[in-house]
Amino acid sequence: MARRRIGQATLLFSSVGAARQSTLDKLLGLIDWAPVEHQLRDVSCSAKGEPAWPPLALFKAMLIAVWHDLSDVRLAEALDDRASFRRFCGFSAHEPTPERTAFVRLRAQLVAHGLNQALFEVVTDQLRAKAITVKTGTLVDATVIASASHADPEAGWAGHQRRKAIHSFKAHVGADADTDLVEALCVTPGNVHDGRAGGGALPEVFGEVYADSAYRGPIFGAAVAVRGGSPRIVQTSMWGRPGDDTLRKLRRWNYDIQRVRCRIEKIFGTWKRSYGLRRMRWRGLAKATLQVHLTAIAYNLRRSLTLLSNPAA
């Protein structure tokens, strides 16, 4: 397939800007992008009769869109205008950049080839190798994300106690308890119970598993046990006799779990507050899954950069 060659001309910057690395420059050097490019080798995002844009450049641009919560239109405008965006994607100073439809075609190709999981793994495996701590446990939880439209037949209604039901998808996430890096995830319609889908959010190595009371029951417990893990699940009741200290034991058990488990809420907060994942941008489970994987990749890159810069973060 014919592809454009980009980055051949020299980028021109002032001497002041050249001496100072931007966050995107640091992220560019954080991993080896060649394995990512290899995963994208069969992707073609060309319009009819035109050479295709390099898929790695478009993929990097979509990460920028996550970090800055940009629509396709605003991403195309920003990529044409900002030197740091061009540098990160590999474009030189004065060459043309992709129009918004190129990102639409890339998403369609990623969904068609089923590459979201492979891209997530090839990036996360590199970041995990840079981890400066020894894994001791895994945080598992789910977050509800409103669907792009109530007419989306692949979403489902999710309600909780007295809260208003939301037409949504649900992201089930497993994160490292020490680094807060997302290691595994799956996406389901919003009406799928956390405990039933939680097994899909377990990484290969997970140690003790911290989760809230929604994960009580045999299904999730069996998924943890079959891989040799140890479940640490919030309980709502405990057997005891009148007058003993059962209630105190229950509170202590839950406190020890909650003070670790609650850290996964910071991940969801970043996704929704900073990365715009309060609502799905596109209809359908496949595109919703792609959006969550892109968000997780972008989050892991930024989180790893923070950890390497400040191990105590």
Give the positions of each predicted feature.
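Charged, often Cys/His-bearing segments associated with DNA-binding zinc-finger transcription factors
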Residues: 1-34, 38, 304-313
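Basic, short loop/linker segments at the boundary and entry of helix-turn-helix/winged-helix-like folds
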Residues: 17-68, 102
